[in-house]
UniProtKB/Swiss-Prot annotation:
Family in the record: Belongs to the RelB/DinJ antitoxin family.
Keywords noted in UniProt: DNA-binding, Repressor, Toxin-antitoxin system, Transcription, Transcription regulation
One Gene Ontology MF term: DNA binding
InterPro entries referenced in this protein's UniProt entry, alphabetically: Arc_rbn_hlx_hlx (IPR013321), DinJ (IPR026262), RelB/DinJ (IPR007337)
Induction (free text): Not induced by the DNA damaging agent mitomycin C. Transcription is autorepressed by DinJ or YafQ-(DinJ)2-YafQ via operator 1, repressed by LexA via operator 2.
Function, as annotated: Antitoxin component of a type II toxin-antitoxin (TA) system. A labile antitoxin that counteracts the effect of cognate toxin YafQ. YafQ and DinJ together bind their own promoter, and repress its expression. There are 2 operators with imperfect inverted repeats (IR) in the dinJ promoter, YafQ-(DinJ)2-YafQ only binds to the first (most upstream) of them to repress transcription; binding to a single IR is sufficient for activity in vivo and in vitro. DinJ alone is as potent a transcriptional repressor as the heterotetramer and also only needs to bind 1 IR to act.
UniProt-recorded name of the protein: Antitoxin DinJ
Gene: dinJ
Keyword Transmembrane helix: no
Gene3D superfamilies: Met repressor-like (1.10.1220.10)
Organism encoding this protein: Escherichia coli (strain K12)
A Gene Ontology biological process term: negative regulation of DNA-templated transcription initiation
Effect of R10A: Nearly complete loss of promoter repression, YafQ-(DinJ)2-YafQ no longer binds DNA
Assembly: Forms a heterotetramer with antitoxin DinJ, with 2 YafQ-DinJ dimers associated via the N-terminus of the DinJ antitoxins (YafQ-(DinJ)2-YafQ). In this complex the toxin activity is inhibited.
Amino acid sequence: MAANAFVRARIDEDLKNQAADVLAGMGLTISDLVRITLTKVAREKALPFDLREPNQLTIQSIKNSEAGIDVHKAKDADDLFDKLGI
């Protein structure tokens, strides 16, 4: 597929430079990233990344789970259903 269209965007120069440095470390340019991202959007009909950020409760729950705090275990499905009361 021939690359014959241009995409322009106004962004903060410092942000652009930071991103370019990170991408250069990966062997990519900003143009490479835009091309890869747009290709995935066109193919998958969705963003190739999640824009949602976890709220404080979710963040704390993840930390607790990773630390083994307030983690509930079940021996099998029947035990789980009993603990859930179903």
